[in-house]
């Protein structure tokens, strides 16, 4: 239990929100068990059911997860009293034992100490697939958040640097998370893998009169696709980088949805995310929005491969995720940019005008020296 996070609501126990929230996640798992018995899946990105094009990152305070309301902690940590009480009221509504389970946990004076997972660290020689397994293992150890209250508010319009600060806070607090939080955390934990491309993949499915939303972090390493993520179901989260094409990866998720009687309606694919944690660019969450029913099977597959090809072209041309960071770093004259500059010059050496301008650079030095002498 991290220090300094203790909140004591009036008339409640002295258990801290962080420790009790983690305990509540385990207790609320019993409430989810009946749903799994009827093959009801409730994974979501946080958008309201029955409404298709609303802003997913903003929305209302009372959002819906496949028809079941859930809340977002917009006050940060430590959790304020109003959010704390609202969470417990919601737990009492969705748990089979109602208020009894809430009173039992909040009234306990000897809550077990929840172990805090260690953030994975890697040797330079550790293969990327092994690193991905370690990252996914860490995400899984945080556990899925069953409380009905998302602890970290994620605004998709925030610059990448702000989202990375939030991910760092997730590792510090070690609270249960949902799928969107897992994507941000996955980006943060893979920033040190420059040969790994990361991009968001969102799913919208339909089951029993309700829409469900889910998101994972797609990855591409060595031409093979995989994914990192968090879900109530094992086959809707981690996928090792073993799929030859993007369409194979997405269709594998569709098959997993089919096993729990969900119909895939839409897939949203984002562009590759920069590896610079200080980048001020925004994540492009939905570069391609694919309507599965309208496209048909063959066109759906073609559009997936078209998106994959577009990502490769942007990275190859240098217009992919690192571009805004490169332009920003050129003004700062960082050592890293100086090392990569010769590569850019070589790529431009075929252009005659730029080649003719190079000899003019030393001529500018005497003028600069003369200016210094005059001063």
UniProtKB/Swiss-Prot annotation:
Catalytic activity: C-terminal L-alpha-aminoacyl-L-glutamyl-L-glutamyl-L-tyrosyl-[tubulin] + H2O = C-terminal L-alpha-aminoacyl-L-glutamyl-L-glutamyl-[tubulin] + L-tyrosine
Keywords for this protein: Carboxypeptidase, Cell cycle, Cytoplasm, Growth arrest, Hydrolase, Protease, Secreted, Ubl conjugation
Location (main, coarse): cytoplasm
GO biological process terms on file: angiogenesis; labyrinthine layer blood vessel development; negative regulation of angiogenesis; negative regulation of blood vessel endothelial cell migration; negative regulation of endothelial cell migration; negative regulation of endothelial cell proliferation; negative regulation of lymphangiogenesis; placenta blood vessel development
Segments of skewed composition (Acidic residues): 53-63
EC number: 3.4.17.17
Region described as Involved in heparin-binding and antiangiogenic activity: 329-375
Gene Ontology CC entries for this record: apical part of cell; cytoplasm; endoplasmic reticulum; extracellular space
Subcellular location(s) per record: Cytoplasm; Secreted
Composition bias type Basic and acidic residues, residue spans: 347-361
Positions annotated as active site in the UniProt record: 179, 214, 231
Compositional bias per record (Low complexity), positions renumbered to this chain: 1-33
Post-translational modification: Ubiquitinated in vitro.
Region (Disordered): 1-69, 309-375
Summary of the tissues where the protein is detected: Expressed at low level in proliferating endothelial cells at the sprouting front but highly expressed in nonproliferating endothelial cells in the termination zone.
Site (Cleavage): 39-40, 86-87
Origin superkingdom: Eukaryota
Gene Ontology molecular function: actin binding; metallocarboxypeptidase activity; tubulin-tyrosine carboxypeptidase
Protein purpose: Tyrosine carboxypeptidase that removes the C-terminal tyrosine residue of alpha-tubulin, thereby regulating microtubule dynamics and function. Acts as an angiogenesis inhibitor: inhibits migration, proliferation and network formation by endothelial cells as well as angiogenesis. This inhibitory effect is selective to endothelial cells as it does not affect the migration of smooth muscle cells or fibroblasts.
Quaternary organization: Interacts with SVBP; interaction enhances VASH1 tyrosine carboxypeptidase activity.
Similarity section: Belongs to the transglutaminase-like superfamily. Vasohibin family.
Annotated protein name in UniProt: Tubulinyl-Tyr carboxypeptidase 1
Source species: Mus musculus (Mouse)
Name of the coding gene: Vash1
